């Protein structure tokens, strides 16, 4: 690894951060050698009703799979996010909210949030919700979404948040799986200037013939738009809150009692409900939030993720609020109505910590740095990236244009299933390399294995596994423990298989290469699609790229690249050939794209994830049965890509 690609921790940051390099190594070693002792100490960072005495009872044996942490202790997640701050921080701002329209703004103190949560917890009880019941939540990005989650946690109900971009069919499958009696929604949402018909989607979902469990639908008025109303079933949020008491004693929950369900997107067949429990999850979310973002009391923290994803759960609600942070919640998208919106919000709210996704960074890159000519950014101290591996070129742009080259970047790798960040730099402890998630968090033991499950040491590439449990880990697939074992523990026995491939360099840094099924086998050689994409995006005229394999008569698989050009760049055959030569120079002849299709847009979910299965089918000329496209932000993109595809049958 060349020294040019190494960004050293500055002495100022190392001196003022929670931990430096030496302390990280000491703590990490202790967490691996003596996990019980390590977590016995660090589990005390949250409040327990009945203190734990038993720390860890875990087995990755797929025939005897069980995960238990702090398992004889009791606590309440809502109390940890609210009640414990009231004595000295009741007037501290918990949530700053900015609507899709920047003129819509609210601030909510910890005292006010506590009152709202208690009221809604009592409202839920008035509608028959009891401990252990699953409550489906389909809300816009408003403070009330956090209120609902914390209210469920307060009374021991299990929330199942469904991303507001999901279709009625997706909602129905989740409601059926969880047998929800109560659904929480809003009349409409607002995102990027568009109205999202939330209540209408719920109505359509509940018309599904297999949905027979729902008794009540609680509806928040967000826009005041006209909605269908079912008497006896639908209830106004406001009428419940007007009469509810603001006193609600938090339910005493076991550490291993469920806190929430979150269904993984893109799962085939029945939805896969990832189940997280209370104690270990809260410890891990709070601890990773503090150390990875080097959070200091009084700072303003902005995670741009939607609450419908795990990032919104762990790093917009539970982790930051457990640590007493001031959290910025934004209803819209950070590049609407103009690409300058992100910078304007950072400056307006004096954001200290920003956590966003590579897809947004690339979208802003494509618009050009002149969009940030008026951006001050002096409040920013730490910046994070989440959701997919970040291309080195996007990392450098983020560092230069948003961070003004003075903010450490934490490129975090984790999953819905892991509950919290597993591999990431720590700002005061880790020299960074653009594109690398670097080193594991405390208690996390990553390894690389070959396809036979043999551990491979040193600088190498392989399948990324985790060798032992950590507190934030999911406990099961809801209602299907066999599926949990089959999906994560049978591929490589005795190890948690992440489904991702990775490289490890000579410094022990991890580089995530993408999903194992995002590997192209070209003439017997395995190529990670992320590597080819990074090379393409490094070209000055490329804003975004997605690479897939397609059937090739000679090579087995060929390389098919979908390329979105920067604003003002003209699509020419000369540029196409230039890009092929560019990739050949950057990686080698083997990685040269066979086909490069110009793409005005790529098929993405509203969280910004590229739906590669559509791209694979289009590249393979299998365009008659693409499957459900209802979760796409813009389904029309598919038709455009099909129309201009390059691999047509003769």
UniProtKB/Swiss-Prot annotation:
Keyword check for Cytoplasm: no
Domain of life: Bacteria
Residue positions, PTM N6-acetyllysine: 609
Record's catalysed reaction(s): acetate + ATP + CoA = acetyl-CoA + AMP + diphosphate
Single GO term (MF): metal ion binding
Gene3D superfamilies for this protein: 3.30.300.30, N-terminal domain of ligase-like
Binding annotation for ATP: 387-389, 411-416, 500, 515, 526
Pfam families: ACAS_N, AMP-binding, AMP-binding_C
Binding site for CoA: 191-194, 311, 335, 523, 584
Residues annotated as binding Mg(2+): 537, 539, 542
Protein's name in the database: Acetyl-coenzyme A synthetase
